[in-house]
């Protein structure tokens, strides 16, 4: 069974290995689409240092484990959608362990989030929202396959935003 827990910068220092260029054959994609050339520790530190730039409810860096194996890291944001005043679980990015890419773990994690209706840390959102790099074909396909609908694209056409209503 999947387990979500908060990232711990001391306990999870090994996750920085995922950003090393020789860690896996998918490293270029990992850097381009998920890490933006930063380590997981740097992403975490950025969230801690800039709370005013984050979600309106909270932002967390989550480690996903399966049988004690760290399989992914997700940055989640809970916020209120100003259009309809609904609670939203935002996912951006989801980073599957590069050695486990293309083995179904990303799909399993997103399906699990849908199954639990996005409820993490006692928050129950009305929808799940995902920001995806326009060139990340695999990720776009995954979210579309799981029923997410494209709701907007950034003005610079770099990112797509997908949404799935889960709790009315």
Where are these regions (language model features)?
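Extreme N-terminal starter segment of soluble prokaryotic enzymes
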Residues: 1-3
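Conserved GNAT acetyl-CoA-binding A-motif
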Residues: 119-132
């Amino acid at each position: 069974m999947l387990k979500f827990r908060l990232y711990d910068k001391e306990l999870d220092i090994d996750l920085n290995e995922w950003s090393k260029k020789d860690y896996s054959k998918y490293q270029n994609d990992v850097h381009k689409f998920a890490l933006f050339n930063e380590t997981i520790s740097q992403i975490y530190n950025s969230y801690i240092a800039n709370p005013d730039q984050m979600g309106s409810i909270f932002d967390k860096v989550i480690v996903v484990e399966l049988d004690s194996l760290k399989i992914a890291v997700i940055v989640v944001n809970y916020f209120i959608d100003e259009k309809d005043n609904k609670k939203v679980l935002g996912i951006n990015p989801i980073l599957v362990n590069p050695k486990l890419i293309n083995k179904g773990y990303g799909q399993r994690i997103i399906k699990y989030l849908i199954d639990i209706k996005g409820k993490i840390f006692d928050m129950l959102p009305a929808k799940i929202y995902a920001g995806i790099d326009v060139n990340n074909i695999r990720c776009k396909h995954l979210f579309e396959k799981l029923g997410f609908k494209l709701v907007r694209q950034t003005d610079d056409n770099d990112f797509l935003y997908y949404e799935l209503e889960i709790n009315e």
